[in-house]
Amino acid sequence: MKAYLALISAAVIGLAACSQEPAAPAAEATPAAEAPASEAPAAEAAPADAAEAPAAGNCAATVESNDNMQFNTKDIQVSKACKEFTITLKHTGTQPKASMGHNLVIAKAEDMDGVFKDGVGAADTDYVKPDDARVVAHTKLIGGGEEASLTLDPAKLADGEYKFACTFPGHGALMNGKVTLVD
């Protein structure tokens, strides 16, 4: 029993040590990317997030992801005044998409668990079930240094509460946020 506990403890310590990233150079670091998004309450994060993903007549937003499984915002504000809204996902990390890939998937809040579940087996389609009617829009899966964009009609966000998340297996618990229709 002691050997079993020792093996489990060693495995946990090894995994924890392997998951730590070295400190990013100051030129790459941004305040929003450094702060763990999962620790900040949504109400406190909104003012800083608004600067990262603005709306109010601006019909585009950029969301950054990194090798620490974080988005730099918890709220994407989409203007009702826009005919089309484009979201660009930038992976600021260095790891390849096979080990630390990210995408950005938008769906109704109540549908997101099903989108995650159905996406797990869909590695060939970037962890998004093909033709999933619950998905409003999504980017392709990207690795470090890459970017991808999606374009959506804001009218699709009129009914209900919408969320965005990364559907790469295991990432959605940390990498998610709210899509807010404004104006």
UniProtKB/Swiss-Prot annotation:
Domain Plastocyanin-like, residue spans: 57-183
Family matches, as Gene3D superfamilies: Cupredoxins - blue copper proteins
Top-level lineage group: Bacteria
Mode of membrane association: Lipid-anchor
Signal peptide span: 1-17
Keyword check for Signal: yes
Cofactor: Cu cation
Cellular localization per UniProt: Cell outer membrane
Annotated region (Disordered), positions in chain: 27-51
PANTHER family: AURACYANIN-B, OUTER MEMBRANE PROTEIN H.8
Protein name: Outer membrane protein H.8
Annotated organism of origin: Neisseria meningitidis serogroup B (strain ATCC BAA-335 / MC58)
Native organism taxonomy: Bacteria, Pseudomonadati, Pseudomonadota, Betaproteobacteria, Neisseriales
